[in-house]
């Protein structure tokens, strides 16, 4: 989830912070910076008020627990299943659950992760599945139930460890800087000063010779094609060296070295020439000195083939009527969209109440000559009111997928999930309790199936470390371990797994 969020906001920053050298441009950049700041601040307000994100990524922890207490099933085969004893009945009877813990230990400079089963073994209330610690020097992993030592590799040598597992998929030179500071940078929405300067440099290139005209509160911009060609590698350099993204870029650049070179070659031999045949424009509408609508288009022979549009209606509550759309059109076929994406949101966020709905729809061309990808439509909702005492939390998602004509599945598939419970906010902690989870799937050929779960589940966000994750002091250096030593470790692990299987509480 963090990578997706980071990409969205990095993209937004590129779109809404553009600069060039004349008076109109200075006005545009000032307006866009103010608009960008208001939009990002609103998102940060939501995250900080309801998930303590800024505090957690400075120092804190999060904990999730799940216990099943009841279940009910509806559908064509529901009665036959309910009349027999299932593994769910055993899980409920023996109070088997799962616990996840995430810790950001600022003092130790380490992210710590722990996953454990509750009551899965006889007479053992908690069984560690895996514990992981990512520090500035080493990455450590341990599973105390099956091995009493900690596996350790240098934090910058994760690629070498992956190459030991599968040398065909992971090259030996895949040195990944997966340190505490790297992961911490990934959590930031805003780039550091050096990264921002690179984006500014790329934007200066793009707008150096742009033609800007103004009609009231609307700006029309036509970009110079040679500047567009120079802008693309400058933007790639900015993304590549972005303090938040450089880790991911270097990882994929080495993992997909051949593909990266092919893209670069194609840009230099084909794409540059095609860019010269295009017209690149922007239309910017301003309301109350803030961006109300911003549209970018790429046109070939008078036909728009790429369109990106974003709109923000109310900056006091930006989440309400926020829209983003992206369309790629077939230049040779009238009114035929190769792909069309639309994101919309509505609702409101205050210090105590968040009531947010968002939708994402993706459509592909229905062309008999090309494979048709599914139509995807998703809706999500989040509601929390920390001023109320009960029934003040709800989160849900529903999704509809229309398969392609070549798919073996006939008709749309509809999936939905909803969780109900309560939220309690203290000065240094937020606790979400989940009482029921409802899931449904409706398929044309199989009918509708509904599953309702009674749960004792919770998610806690805390400014403090709720509990620490302790690793075994004795370590195994993964990169220095010999084949014969691995065989001994394997035998010990298998023996412990066999012993544990006799203690299963299932």
Go through each PLM region and give its residues.
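Subset-of-secretome marker
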Residues: 21-506
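Bacterial N-terminal signal peptides that target proteins for export
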Residues: 1-8
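C-terminal motif of bacterial Sec signal peptides marking the signal peptidase cleavage site
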Residues: 16-19
């Amino acid at each position: 989830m963090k990578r997706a969020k980071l990409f969205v906001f990095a993209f937004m920053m590129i779109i809404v912070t553009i600069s060039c050298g004349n008076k109109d441009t200075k006005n545009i950049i000032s307006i866009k910076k103010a608009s960008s700041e208001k939009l990002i601040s609103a998102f940060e307000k939501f995250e900080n008020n309801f998930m303590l994100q800024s505090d957690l990524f400075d120092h804190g922890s999060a904990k999730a627990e799940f216990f099943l207490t009841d279940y009910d099933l509806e559908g064509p085969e529901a009665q036959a299943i309910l009349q027999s004893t299932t593994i769910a009945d055993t899980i409920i009877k023996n109070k088997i659950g799962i616990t996840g813990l995430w810790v950001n230990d600022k003092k130790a400079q380490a992210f710590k992760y722990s996953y454990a089963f509750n009551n899965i073994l006889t007479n053992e209330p908690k069984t560690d599945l895996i514990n992981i610690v990512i520090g500035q020097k080493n990455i450590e992993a341990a599973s105390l139930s099956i091995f009493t030592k900690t596996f350790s590799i240098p934090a910058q040598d994760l690629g070498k460890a992956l190459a030991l597992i599968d040398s065909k998929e992971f090259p030996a030179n895949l040195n990944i800087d997966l340190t505490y500071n790297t992961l911490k940078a990934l959590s930031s929405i805003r780039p550091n000063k050096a990264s921002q300067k690179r984006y500014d440099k790329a934007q200066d290139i793009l707008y150096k010779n742009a033609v800007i005209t103004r009609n009231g509160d609307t700006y029309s911009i036509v970009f110079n094609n040679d500047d567009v060609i120079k802008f693309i590698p400058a933007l790639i350099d900015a993304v590549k060296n972005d303090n938040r993204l450089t880790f991911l870029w270097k990882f994929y650049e080495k993992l997909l070295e051949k593909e990266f070179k092919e893209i670069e070659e194609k840009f230099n031999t084909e794409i540059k020439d095609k860019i010269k045949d295009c017209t690149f424009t922007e239309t910017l509408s301003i309301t109350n000195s803030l961006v109300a609508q911003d549209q970018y288009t790429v046109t070939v022979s008078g036909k728009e083939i790429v369109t990106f549009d974003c709109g923000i209606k109310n900056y006091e509550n930006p989440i309400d009527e926020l829209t983003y759309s992206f369309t790629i059109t077939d230049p040779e076929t009238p009114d035929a969209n190769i792909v069309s994406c639309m994101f919309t949101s509505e609702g409101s966020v205050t210090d105590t109440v968040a009531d947010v709905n968002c939708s994402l729809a993706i459509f592909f061309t229905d062309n008999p000559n090309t494979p048709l990808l599914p139509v995807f439509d998703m809706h999500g909702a989040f509601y929390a009111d920390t001023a109320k005492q009960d029934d003040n939390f709800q989160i849900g998602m529903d999704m509809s997928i229309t398969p392609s004509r070549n798919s073996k599945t006939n008709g749309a598939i509809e999936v939905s999930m909803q969780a109900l419970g309560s939220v309690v906010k203290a000065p240094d902690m937020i606790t979400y309790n989940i009482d029921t989870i409802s899931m449904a799937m409706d398929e044309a050929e199989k009918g509708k199936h509904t599953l309702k779960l009674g749960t004792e589940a919770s998610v806690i966000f805390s400014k403090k470390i709720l509990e620490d994750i302790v690793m075994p002091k004795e370590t195994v250096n993964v990169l220095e371990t010999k084949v014969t030593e691995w065989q001994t470790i394997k035998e010990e692990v298998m023996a412990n797994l066999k012993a544990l299987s006799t203690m299963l509480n299932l």
